Amino acid sequence: SKMTEHEGVSFLVDVGTNAEVVIGNRDWLMACAGAAGPALESGVADMGMMAAPGVIDSVVINPHTVAFTIGTIPERGGTPATENRGPMGICGSGLIDLVSQLFLAGMIDLMGKFVPDRCGERLTETDGIGHLMVVPAEASGTGEPLTLSQIDIDGLIRSKAAMYTILTTIAKTVNIPFEDIGRFFVAGTFGSYINPRSAINIGMIPDLPLNTYVSLGNTSLAGATMALLGVDAQKSLFHIRDQITYLELNVNQEFMNLFSAAKFLPHTDRSLFPSVKRWGGDNTVPAGEKIGV
C-alpha cells in the first residue's frame, strides 16, 4: 500500500474471520483488530461455500420485477462454470451483494427482516424461520434450492456492524473523520473480492467515493516474499512495527453503543450513508456468468 510513505491519511483493512485495521500515514500509525467476519465464512450461511468456480459471487435484483440475476465465478480461462450445472452455493462477497440488493429492492427492511409482500412466493417458513429462495432446485447445481435464511441475514448484519464499528472507533480515537481518508486499502483474499458499492449499501464500510477503495490482494504473502528477498524490506518492516500504536477495543467504553447503532441497514444514522438509495442502486454484475432466476 505504501501508506507509510505518504502524508495523506489512509486505512488498511484485512478482512477475514477477524478484521485487522491500520490507520495512519508516514508519521504515525494506529492498529486494532476485532471479530468481524464469522458470518462471511463458508458453512455459516445455509448455502455458504468457499469461493470457487460455480459459486455465486454477485447478485442483481430488478427492483421493479424483483427478478434475480446471478453471477458465478467462472472456470480458469473464463469458461462459465455453470454451463452444464447451476450455482453450487454462495461465497462471502456474493452474500454481501445479495443482502445489499435485497435491501435496495425493498425485500428486507432496515432491520434486515424479510418483507413478505415484496418477497412473494420466494419466501417460505420452516420452524418459524423465514427462508428466501435465491436459486430454485431445477436451476441449482445441487438439485436442491439455494436459500437465504433470516438467521443468515442476522449473522451478516452483526458482522457488518462489527466491521463498521471497528473503523469508526479507531477513526474517532485519532480524531480523523472518514471524509479525510485519502485511500482505503482492502487486503486479504476474501476482502479483495468484496464489491465496495454493496458493502457501503449495507453499512459495512464508510460511504466514500468508490475510487477511494483499493484492492491489494494477498498482502501477507506479498510482504513475506519481500522480506525474504531483501534486507532493506526487513528493516522497513521493523521500522513500521515500531511506529504502530495498538488500540485495545475490548476496553473502549463507546464500542458497544456504536455497535448497537450499526446493526441496521445501513445504519441508524442515515446521514452517514447519503449515497444509499433504496429501490435502486448500481445494478451491474462483475465478470462471471449471469443467470436469470
Regions inferred by a protein language model and the residue ranges of each:
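Short glycine/threonine-rich loop-to-helix capping motif typified by GTGT followed
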Residues: 128, 176-179, 188-207, 249-262
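Glycine-rich and small/hydrophobic secondary-structure elements
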Residues: 150-160, 203-226
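Gly/charged contiguous loops adjacent to phosphate- or pyrophosphate-bearing nucleotide/cofactor binding elements
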Residues: 96-158
